[in-house]
Curated annotation (Swiss-Prot):
This is Lysine--tRNA ligase. The lineage of its organism: Bacteria, Pseudomonadati, Pseudomonadota, Alphaproteobacteria, Rickettsiales. It comes from Rickettsia typhi (strain ATCC VR-144 / Wilmington). Pfam families: tRNA-synt_1f. GO terms for cellular component: cytoplasm. It comes from the Bacteria. Keywords: Aminoacyl-tRNA synthetase, ATP-binding, Cytoplasm, Ligase, Nucleotide-binding, Protein biosynthesis. It is found in: Cytoplasm. The gene is lysS. GO terms for molecular function: ATP binding; lysine-tRNA ligase activity; tRNA binding. GO terms for biological process: lysyl-tRNA aminoacylation. SUPFAM superfamilies: An anticodon-binding domain of class I aminoacyl-tRNA synthetases, Nucleotidylyl transferase. It is an enzyme of class 6 (ligase). ATP binds at residue 293.
Length: 526
C-alpha cells in the first residue's frame, strides 16, 4: 500500500471513501472490459440544471480520486433517457401547445419547440453536451434511443423475456392492486402512433423475441422487443442498463433511493453485478421545495457564474452531498469566501492527509491553483460596493491598489474577477433590499466617538488597532453583546444587517472616506 493511498484513505474525504468502495468491489483487479465505468444519468424532459452539474461534478471527483488510488483505466458515460415518453409539458419552454400534441411520444420523436434541432430530445441532449463541455468534463455521451435502436441492449432485452416471470414477481408487490393488473416491464412503441405504450402484455415469447398486446381497437399486436420496438419501464431499464453496460459506479438522487434495491436485483437477475452506488440529497429552492428541470425553479449554473467563479459552485457541490441543501442566491458570497479560505489553507499546509481532506483538492482534481486576494473577500468587496456604488470595477480598484499596491487587475486576475462579480451581485440583490436604521441619540454619541477615533489614526494604522478601537467604542456605549453594536453600525452605515470587520473595511475604504460616510449619517442633507 503506497503512502499516497494510506494518506488519501486517512483523510476521510468522501470521494476517496467512494473510490475505495469501488476498488474493494473489484478486489483490486482490472474488470474484464478493461476499465472501470462511471455513469451519470440525464432526464431530457427539461433543460440541464444545477443538479445536472452537481451529479457530473461529484462523479468526476470520485473518478479522479479512484485514479489516485489505482492504475486501472476509467471511463465516464453520461446516459440520456431520451426514449422516455413525454408525461407533461415543461412550463419553461416555447411553443408548449405544439409540444402538448405529442404526449407519450419518445422525446426524440417530438419536434423541437426551439426550432434548432431534429427533435425535442436532440435539442436537450445538445444542451447537455454543450453544458458538460463548457466545464471540461471528459465523458462519452449515450442516447437511450440510439442504444435501443442500434441493438446495444438487444441481448439483455431477450434475457428480460427469459426472466419475465422472475422480474414480474419482483416488481408486482411494489404496486397498488389496480396497477398490478396493467403493469408490464416492456413498453411497446405503437406502430401506428409512435407513442410509448403502457399496456398489459398478453403474451411474451423469448424464442421469438416478441411481446403481444391489444391496441385501442382491441386488436392483437405483436412486436419485437429488440431494435427499438420496445423500451423498458424505468425501474427495469435502470437495472438492465447496469447489466448491459457493466457499470461499476453510479450516483443518483434521493428520489431513486427507494427503488435502488429493485435496480440492483434486476441487474442480478439479468446476470449482471450491481455497481457501487451513492445516493445524494436533492437541492431545495428558497421555499424548501425540490428543484425541477420542468418547473425551472432553481438557480441555473449560468446564473451562478454571473456572480461567482466555477470553483465556488464546485465547492457547494462538494460539501455534504448526502445532506439536503437550500440553493438560492444568498449562498453565493459565503461559498466564494469559503473557497478563498480553503485555497489559502491548502497552500500553507504540508501534511498530505490534511491536504487530501481539503475540498479544493477534489474541486481541482489535485492540481490546485494558488490564488492571492491580499486578505480581501467577496463580502468585503460587496460592502465596499455598498458605500461607493461604483458603475464599474475600476472604482473598486482605486481602493484596492491603495490598500495593497502590489495588486493590479493584470497580476491579480482572480481578484479582478471578484470585483466584477461583487458589483454585479450588489446591484442585483443587495441594493434593492437596503434599509437604513434611523440614527438615535445613543447612535449619535457612538458616531461622534468613531469620528474622534478616525481623526487620531491614518491609513497606515494597523487593522487590528482599528478593530480594537471600534470594540472599545461599543463597550463604552454599554452594549453587553457587541454583535448588536456592530449590527446597528451595519444598518446605519451600510443599510444591511451584516457587514465586514471594520478594521479591514476602514483600511480598504480609507480613513477620510470613512469619516465622510459617518458625517453623512450624522448630518444628513435634507
Amino acid at each position: 500500500m503506497s503512502v499516497i493511498w494510506k494518506d488519501a484513505i486517512r483523510s476521510n474525504a468522501w470521494p476517496f471513501i467512494e473510490a475505495k468502495k469501488i476498488l474493494d468491489s473489484l478486489n483490486g483487479k482490472v474488470p474484464e472490459k478493461g476499465y472501470v465505468l462511471f455513469e451519470t444519468g440525464y432526464g431530457p424532459s427539461g433543460l440541464p440544471h444545477i443538479g445536472t452539474f452537481a451529479e457530473n461534478a461529484r462523479v468526476v471527483m470520485v473518478q479522479k480520486a479512484f485514479e489516485q488510488l489505482s492504475d486501472i483505466p476509467t471511463k465516464l458515460i453520461c446516459f440520456s433517457d431520451d426514449m422516455d415518453g413525454l408525461r407533461k409539458v415543461p412550463s419553461n419552454i416555447p411553443n408548449p401547445e405544439m409540444v402538448a400534441q405529442y404526449m407519450d411520444m419518445p422525446l426524440t420523436s417530438i419536434p423541437d419547440p426551439f426550432g434548432e434541432c431534429k427533435s425535442y430530445g436532440h435539442y436537450m441532449n445538445a444542451k447537455l453536451c454543450t453544458f458538460l463541455d463548457k466545464f471540461g468534463f471528459q465523458y462519452e455521451f449515450y442516447s437511450s434511443t440510439n442504444c435501443y435502436k442500434a441493438g446495444l441492449f438487444d441481448d439483455m432485452l431477450i434475457r428480460v423475456l427469459e426472466k419475465y416471470d422472475e422480474i414480474m414477481a419482483l416488481m408486482l408487490p411494489t404496486f397498488r392492486e389496480e396497477r398490478k393488473t396493467t403493469y408490464a416491464p416492456f413498453m411497446p412503441i405503437c406502430p401506428k402512433t409512435g407513442k410509448v405504450l403502457q399496456v398489459p402484455i398478453e403474451k411474451w415469447d423469448a424464442r421469438a423475441g416478441t411481446v403481444s398486446y391489444k391496441d385501442e381497437d382491441g386488436n392483437d399486436v405483436e412486436v419485437p422487443v429488440t431494435g427499438g420496438h420496445c423500451k423498458l419501464q424505468w425501474k427495469p431499464d435502470f437495472g438492465m442498463r447496469w447489466a448491459a453496460l457493466n457499470v461499476d459506479y453510479e450516483m443518483y438522487g434521493k428520489d431513486h433511493l427507494a427503488n435502488s434495491r429493485l435496480y440492483s436485483k434486476i441487474c442480478q437477475i439479468l446476470g449482471g453485478k450491481p455497481p457501487v452506488q451513492f445516493c445524494y440529497e436533492l437541492f431545495l429552492d428558497e421555499n424548501g421545495e425540490k428543484i425541477s428541470k420542468s418547473r425551472g425553479n432553481s438557480i441555473s449554473v449560468d446564473d451562478w457564474l454571473k456572480y461567482a467563479s466555477v470553483e465556488s459552485i464546485a465547492l457547494f457541490m462538494y460539501k455534504n452531498p448526502a445532506r439536503a441543501k437550500r440553493l438560492f442566491f444568498d449562498v453565493i458570497p459565503k461559498n466564494v469566501d469559503e473557497y478563498i479560505t480553503l485555497n489559502q489553507k491548502y497552500h500553507l499546509e504540508e501534511d498530505m492527509v490534511t491536504r487530501f481532506a481539503n475540498p479544493v483538492y477534489h474541486i481541482h482534481h489535485g492540481n490546485v491553483p494558488k490564488i492571492e486576494t491580499f486578505g480581501l473577500t467577496y463580502s468585503l468587496l460587496l460592502n465596499l460596493t455598498a458605500v461607493c456604488n461604483p458603475s464599474d470595477k475600476s472604482v473598486l480598484w482605486g481602493f484596492i491598489t491603495k490598500y495593497e499596491p502590489k495588486a493590479t487587475p493584470n497580476t491579480s486576475t482572480y481578484l479582478d474577477h471578484l470585483a466584477e462579480f461583487a458589483i454585479r451581485y450588489y446591484h442585483d440583490f443587495v441594493q434593492i433590499h437596503k434599509s437604513y436604521l434611523v440614527v438615535s441619540e445613543k447612535h449619535k454619541i457612538i458616531l461622534y466617538d468613531i469620528l474622534d477615533m478616525l481623526s487620531n489614526i491614518t491609513d497606515q494604522t494597523e487593522e487590528e488597532n482599528i478593530q480594537k478601537a471600534m470594540y472599545d467604542i461599543g463597550m463604552k456605549a454599554g452594549y453587553k453583546n457587541l454583535r448588536y453594536y456592530f449590527k446597528d453600525l451595519y444598518q446605519i452605515l451600510l443599510g444591511q444587517n451584516e457587514g465586514p470587520r471594520f478594521g479591514t473595511f476602514i483600511k480598504l475604504y480609507g480613513v477620510e472616506a470613512t469619516k465622510k460616510l459617518v458625517e453623512e449619517k450624522l448630518y444628513p442633507v435634507a
